From Swiss-Prot:
Keywords: Hydrolase, Secreted, Virulence. It comes from the Bacteria. Its EC number is 3.1.3.-. The gene is sopB. This is Inositol phosphate phosphatase SopB. The lineage of its organism: Bacteria, Pseudomonadati, Pseudomonadota, Gammaproteobacteria, Enterobacterales. Converts phosphatidylinositol 3,4,5-trisphosphate (PtdIns 3,4,5-P3) to PtdIns 3-P and prevents the transition of PtdIns 3-P to PtdIns 3,5-P2. It is one of the known effectors injected by Salmonella into the host cell and is required for invasion and for an efficient generation and maintenance of Salmonella-containing vacuole (SVC). Alteration of the phosphoinositide composition of the plasma membrane causes membrane ruffling and actin cytoskeleton rearrangements. It is an enzyme of class 3 (hydrolase). Gene3D superfamilies: Cell division control protein 42 homolog (1.20.58.450). It comes from Salmonella dublin. The active site is at C460.
Length: 561
């Protein structure tokens, strides 16, 4: 079928959308014959935004009159390439419109990166919608479906194909090093697929080098976006772990309509988080594999907005809390299957004890107050577990923290200070406002968990944006503590030295790379500009550098679920 004949049969709206896409052709270039698949990946782009400012510098007359965006052309190119691959999966590699688009992209590819134009940005943002419209038009042609039904089918088909593409790509360890004041810190993000004792990953349903992306929202077998995150420092000729925790997506498979399957799925995901938590404690894992029943303390910090006014995160929080409650009844022993060093499944016995928090950290929670009351009903119980029943700031800590301090450990002062800070935040409801530090309570809960030898775990809905920012805030404070031997006051903006640490962490924590296997594009949606300005969180002030803020934001604003 020729492209022109397709336009005669497609809707006017679809015609106009694809005419706009085809304007990316460069004049005088011929379209090469191709197989309708996406072109090769663009060369890697530098992490910083590059803007030419020298009088003689130019990208050609075409770009001289174009407004540039803050997005790398290579990143946009690779996003469009991945979307075309999904389209080819649904429509087949011989589709003439896909062939045309792929060839145009190949011709337009440039070796040197540059900021994209606003027109290129708009084309990238519209591509997914246009591909779904193309699939719908093809479905109408072939099956005679009504337009609305064809569009619904197309959206589901594209989503399923995209999930499979993202899940089936290699999920690999991300490791970056940063240097500050002569100290070398290594940030490591280890995906579930690489949590191994032997040649295979430890999970009974093996990941086989792959993963479960944040968009796979009906998956009832695996946790979404499950990683172990660590930061270590090289001292005295060896690496010392400063922090280790587990990050993941919400436990609720929230697009599963059957309530029983949704609950089973949430519990399966929770078991995988517990398995990952056990893996993060090698000595405890070895005891469990030797047949000993082991106790495992975990501090779970949800970052969702516990309200259904916008979205359904309130229901997701309920599903997650129900899963933790089901697995952690007092005195309950649970059996997990773990693949040992020989690759055989082995049953281990653990007694899990979970302090389950939820702390809203987005604009809906901190600027509009959504979900705060519901979250605090969970948080009060979890604080009793962690700190004892007397939550007055001046009271001696009880609970897990009291048990730890009774041993007079080397980190006594750090633990005592974190406990006091958390109590102050709770007493004054500081976690209900941005106050210059959106993650003030969540970040300190995770740090305190690590300091008392419990396992910190944290998650938002997807396990990438809010979860990634929490990861960066933890590592910022951990490195700052290692450098200054002092903890930051709650609700304080970083000073210039703290901003330098934060900037380095944001660019070298592995979080931007973690977003790519989940969505096909690197970037964090926490970085946004809302109108009116009063709705914005304090991240521009916390980061202190517009270029780095934009770099961390990446192409997240162009990606739609």
């Amino acid at each position: 079928m020729q492209i022109q004949s397709f336009y005669h049969s497609a809707s006017l709206k679809t015609q106009e959308a694809f005419k706009s896409l085809q304007k990316t052709l460069y004049n005088g270039m011929q379209i090469l014959s191709g197989q309708g698949k996406a072109p090769a990946k663009a060369p890697d782009a530098r992490p910083e935004i590059i803007v030419l400012r020298e009088p003689g510098a130019t990208w050609g007359n075409y770009l001289q009159h174009q407004k540039t965006s803050n997005h790398s052309l290579h990143n946009l190119y690779n996003l469009r390439r991945d979307l075309l691959t999904v389209g080819a999966t649904v429509l087949g590699k011989q589709d003439p419109v896909l062939t045309s688009m792929a060839n145009q992209m190949e011709l337009a590819k440039v070796k040197a990166d540059r900021p994209a134009t606003k027109q290129e940005e708009a084309a990238a943002k519209a591509l997914k919608k246009n591909l779904i419209e193309l699939i719908a038009a093809r479905t109408q042609q072939q099956d005679g479906l009504p337009a609305k039904e064809a569009h619904r089918f197309a959206a589901v088909a594209f989503r399923d194909a995209q999930d499979k593409q993202l899940n089936n790509q290699p999920w690999q360890t991300i490791k970056n090093t940063l240097t500050h004041n002569g100290h070398h810190y290594t940030n490591t993000q280890l995906p579930a697929a690489e949590m191994k004792i032997g040649a295979k990953d430890i999970f009974p349903s093996a990941y086989e080098g792959k993963g479960v992306c944040s968009w796979d929202t009906k998956n009832i077998h695996h946790a979404n976006n499950l990683w172990m995150s660590t930061v270590s420092v090289h001292e005295d000729g060896k690496d010392k772990t400063l922090f280790c925790g587990i990050r993941h997506g919400v436990l609720s498979p929230y697009h599963e309509k059957d309530p029983l399957l949704r609950q089973v799925g949430a519990e399966n995901k929770a078991k995988e988080v517990l398995t990952a938590a056990l893996f993060s404690k090698p000595e405890l894992l070895n005891k469990a594999l030797a047949g000993e029943a082991v106790s495992l303390k975990l501090v779970s910090v949800g970052l969702l907005t516990a309200s259904n006014i916008f979205g359904k995160e309130g229901t997701m929080v309920e599903d997650q809390m129900r899963a933790w409650q089901s697995l952690t009844q007092p005195g309950k022993m649970i059996h997990l299957k773990i693949r040992n060093k020989d690759g055989d499944l082995q049953t281990v016995k653990i007694k899990p004890d979970v302090a389950a928090f939820n702390v809203g950290v987005n604009e809906l929670a901190l600027k509009l107050g959504f979900g705060l009351k519901a979250s605090d009903s969970y948080n009060a119980e979890a604080l009793y577990q962690l700190l004892g029943n007397d939550l007055r700031p001046e009271a001696r800590p009880g609970g897990w923290v009291g048990e730890w301090l009774a041993q007079y450990p080397d980190n006594y002062e750090v633990v005592n200070t974190l406990a006091r800070q958390i109590k102050d935040i709770w007493k004054n409801n500081q976690h209900h406002k941005d106050g210059g530090e959106p993650y003030k309570l969540a970040q300190r809960l995770a740090m305190l968990a690590h300091e008392i030898d419990a396992v910190p775990a944290w998650n938002c809905k997807s396990g990438k944006d809010r979860t990634g920012m929490m990861d960066s805030e933890i590592k910022r404070e951990i490195i700052s503590l290692h450098q200054t031997h002092m903890l930051s006051a709650p609700g304080s903006l970083p000073d210039s030295g703290g901003q330098k640490i934060f900037q380095k962490v944001l660019l070298n924590s592995g979080n931007p790379g973690d977003s790519e296997p989940n969505t096909g594009g690197a970037g964090n949606k926490v970085m946004k500009n809302l109108s009116p300005e009063v709705l914005n969180l304090s991240y521009q002030k916390r980061v202190g550098d517009e270029n780095i803020w934009q770099s961390v934001k990446g192409i997240s604003s162009l990606i739609t679920s």
